[in-house]
Design a protein with these regions (language model features):
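Conserved catalytic Lys-bearing alpha helix of Rossmann-like short-chain dehydrogenase/reductases
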Residues: 136-142, 193-201
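SDR active-site strand-loop-helix element
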Residues: 42, 72, 112-116, 154-160, ...
Length: 257
């Protein structure tokens, strides 16, 4: 960096997000294995994917880890808008592509964070076929790519929806407790897709020794959620901001903790 230049923060004007990133960098997370490595993040413009990109870039700035971040995006314009300052800083390389097609990238890749997925409940219902194919074909392409690159590690971002509907008398569930999922409901395109992809990951680990781990995420929200996001928490927030009544389409008996 030349004298007089100001190094931009990862989250630009969002001070809350920036404080969160720097707090994580100052913690004792076991991050040194990524030093000097290349990390591919799919779904990089999404809520979780973008946070991964920002966090790794923050490690580069604060700890000089020299992680090469490959942000895979479908929309090049959106990717440049979100990460242009990090591209200019040399932290991020944009890889424009669709996970539903084979991944084309000539350089080495050491780690993969696979977060590309359909995320809107409305989309699951209106486009169940695409939801399923994005999960299965998309992750299959990423796993094939991981096999070719002989990666050191991969994380697949799954969902608590793989647990289905638990028994009514169950106070707590473990990772080994799986409830019912209605296979004939188009809304199940997401949860059944996630279940099948977890099996696909386990199969690649068994047959091709791909070092893939699975993280089952709960409802995820925070700074960076798009205003038009179709999930229920975003609709509640919009109703509050726009002073509209909240309209429930169920009896409201579902409980999450």
């Amino acid at each position: 960096m030349e004298n007089g230049e100001v190094e931009m923060n990862e989250c630009m004007e969002n001070e809350i997000m920036q404080q969160d990133l720097e707090m994580l960098v100052d913690s004792d997370l076991p991050i040194t294995a990524l030093e000097g490595k290349s990390v591919l993040v799919t779904g990089a413009t999404g809520l979780i994917g973008s946070q991964m990109v920002y966090l790794l870039a923050c490690y580069n700035r604060m700890r000089n880890l020299q992680i090469h971040i490959i942000a895979m995006v479908r929309n090049e314009e959106k990717g440049k808008k979100m990460f242009s300052h990090l591209i200019g800083r040399g932290d991020v390389e944009l890889l424009v592509g669709d996970i539903n097609r084979p991944v084309v990238y000539s350089d080495s890749v050491d780690y993969i964070i696979h977060g590309a997925s359909a995320t809107s409940s409305k989309y699951f219902v209106s486009n169940p076929v695409e939801t399923i194919y994005t999960a299965l074909d998309g992750t299959s392409n990423i796993l094939k790519f991981a096999t070719e690159k002989k990666i050191n590690g991969m994380v697949y971002l799954s969902s608590l929806e793989v647990y289905g509907t638990p028994e009514k008398d169950a106070d707590l569930i473990t990772e080994n407790d799986y409830g019912y999922i209605e296979p004939l409901s188009v809304r199940s395109s997401y949860s059944e897709g996630k279940r099948m992809v977890e099996c696909l990951c386990a199969s690649y680990a068994h047959e091709y020794s791909v070092p893939v781990k699975i993280a089952r995420l709960s409802q995820t929200f925070g700074p960076g959620v798009a205003y038009e996001d179709g999930r229920v928490f975003a609709e509640f927030a919009r109703c509050a901001l726009e002073q509209r009544d909240i309209v429930l389409h169920t009896q409201g008996h579902t409980v999450r903790s």
